[in-house]
């Protein structure tokens, strides 16, 4: 929706950004992420949406915060697509569920359990929330190149950050890698509706079921960002061959 020639919420227009966008939740992280770009500059700030642009390998890229939760994340993706974006990597944090996922690891999401509300406004619950294969592959290549400990798997998206896992839901945990990523399922579903690419990489802060988890390395919260940036470089190279 345009108001005075700009998208209503993110306050930019077509031509302001390129194809590739990193999506953190926290507006304060945008400037930090943009420092990995060449020629970074802030181009918009409105409500929870802060937007910086720059380039990687000579190709325009951007970072846009989404705030907390599925509704605001869906708005960001909808409006970014209207402005020309078609490839998204969500960068965030999570807790681990299975014992092998430790604090300091990163998780590359292949799909998400839709236990939130936003995605249901787009597609019925039977429709799976899955990440784009090319983005997952690029993140996998990036994590290997950077030497980060990583895992791939399904994550759990819920609307309640503090909500307890009910006993009846516990069997789900055996098949999950990470949980408490409130809006990833929403982004995956919106991306499929809009026919764009979306993936996610999460920094694991702790293991929810392991009190003896090792101390988190100082650079742990930046590992997901570095993996996302390197994955975009991979996608740029692959897309240039198409």
Task: Map each language-model feature to its residues.
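Metabolite-binding pocket within alpha/beta catalytic cores that recognizes anionic/polar moieties
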Residues: 1-137
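Buried hydrophobic positions in well-ordered alpha/beta secondary-structure cores of metabolic enzymes
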Residues: 26, 63, 92, 155, ...
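Flexible, glycine/charged-enriched surface loops at secondary-structure junctions
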Residues: 40-45, 147-154, 235-242
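Expand to "…catalyze enediolate/carbanion chemistry for C-C bond making/breaking, isomerization
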Residues: 82, 162-167, 171-173, 201, ...
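Active-site rim beta-loop-alpha module in soluble metabolic enzymes
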Residues: 130-183
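Generic non-transmembrane alpha-helical segments
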Residues: 138-146, 190, 227-238
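Zn-dependent metallopeptidase/amidohydrolase metal-coordination segment
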Residues: 186-217
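His/Asp/Glu-rich mid-to-C-terminal helical/loop segments that flank catalytic regions of hydrolases
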Residues: 208-242
